[in-house]
Structure formats: C-alpha cells, structure tokens
Amino acid sequence: MTAAQRRSAIYDQLTAAQTPISATALARQFSVTRQVVVGDIALLRAEGHSITATPRGYMIPAETGLRRTIACHHSGEDTQKELFAMVDCGCTVVDVIVEHPVYGQLTAPLALSSRYDVEQFIHRMKTSHAQPISALTGGVHLHTLSCPSEAVFAHLKATLANMGMLYDAD
C-alpha cells in the first residue's frame, strides 16, 4: 500500500466511523507508527479535508443540527454538571473556547454527545490531573453546540440559567 492509498483508506475509515478513531488504532490497522498517522492526518487536512482531533481520536465532524454558541461561567468542579445538562438536552458539545490575553481565542474540540462521552472526558481530566481550559479565564468560556432545534437550545439556556452557569456580563 502506498502512502497515498493509506491516506485515502484512513479518510474512508474516518468518514464511515460513528465515533472518533485514535491514531494508535489507525497505526495498528495500517502497520505504521502513530507519528506516520499524525503526518497523514496533517496532509489530509492540507488537502482541504475537515478532520477534527478530539480527546478520543480523529473524526469527520457531522454537519447535522443547528450550530449555536453559548457563554458559560462555573468552577472546574461543575464541568461535569454543565456537560451532562448539555447532552441530556440532546445537544452535542462540539468544542470549548476561551479568550487568552496573549494567544487570543483558544479552541479545544470536544465532540461530546452522551453521558458516557462526558464521563470518559471527566475521567481523563482527573487521571491526568489537568485543569479545564476555562481555568485560564476564571471559569468564563464558550461552547459551540450542535442542537436538534431552536426549542432544545432555548430549553438548554433556561436549564443552565437555573443552574447558575449561564454567563451574564452584568
């Protein structure tokens, strides 16, 4: 298999996948190193393919649902509650965004669609002793969401407001 054929096969795998695929799994499948897969992904992106790196692996972002952005504010301890509220309302948490004073906007892909996804994300945060990216901004952050409808987004905003997590600049 040539490198170009491998890249095409990797893209086909990602397109067909319902969940993210790790670079390690792709490396095993194609009998190459993880670094080769990372390079292949970079080349596929350079060709114009939309490939997202999530904490669970690579994926092709689904273009379903309404894209909405919501501003939130809470402590790191409340991250799981916030994310559960979002997925329980039927939304996919696409990413988290913070505004850094030097780097500007920092965006981290999440792709969380279920309680299981959230639990896995929180587990990785705890076992790696990592702080949420919102720790850089005192808990203020944005989420890009994919929502099934405007009604669901409105319900989520009301839910987060009741939880005291919806950011209000006042």
Question: Model-derived features: where do they sit?
Answer:
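Extreme N-terminal segment that seeds HTH/winged-HTH DNA-binding domains in transcriptional regulators
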Residues: 1-29
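Short, hydrophobic-biased segments on the C-terminal half of alpha helices
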Residues: 41-42
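Conserved functional loop/turn residues at catalytic and ligand-binding sites
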Residues: 48
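Minor-groove-contacting beta-hairpin "wing" of winged helix-turn-helix DNA-binding domains
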Residues: 51-62
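Mid-protein regulatory/catalytic core that forms ligand/cofactor-binding pockets
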Residues: 65-170
